[in-house]
């Protein structure tokens, strides 16, 4: 548990420090669940936090599916959150692009859920066809569940031949599962960047736009202004959850086991 102004404090369990907070931002993978399995004790901790009047908001880096899919996944594990209590980096991408529309068409990659739509923006679900890549004016990478070297090479060659805006809805490098780590978009993008492709525009933790939206949502859920010093980000990853929270001025809580 990181006090921004008092150093680091180690606590045996999250429930031991609940009295320090009026609101908690909760990462999903590694905090609430690991793959299809729930983290032991988290249901009881969530229940105690709610009993203490703490406002809860799941803030997850996930672009392949929308926030409703995450809600349903958590519900099947016994964790109940309302639609408003979950913000995904995919949702952040949808909101940002609604207000900052690139000149279309926008090529969509890695979508596993409902259609990704932005009002008044022509979105095309790309296939492994280089001519489709070359016809769009910008790209949005949602996830890498089915990513392979063909997708990687097509994106590289298309951007290398004709640089265009690239938006990425998940800044994770890896995600924890029960017996493995899945490779996430930032890993693949790091290889493109090392080969000279321009930096993408990232949505999700550790970047501030998702925390801006989270603060607005916390105010809506709680019905009051909660100081940053009373809001904690609970995560298991230093370079997304903890870095993002500390940079934004929140307290950060690193879950280590």
Q: Which residues make up each language-model segment?
A:
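HAD-like aspartate-dependent phosphatase fold
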Residues: 1-257
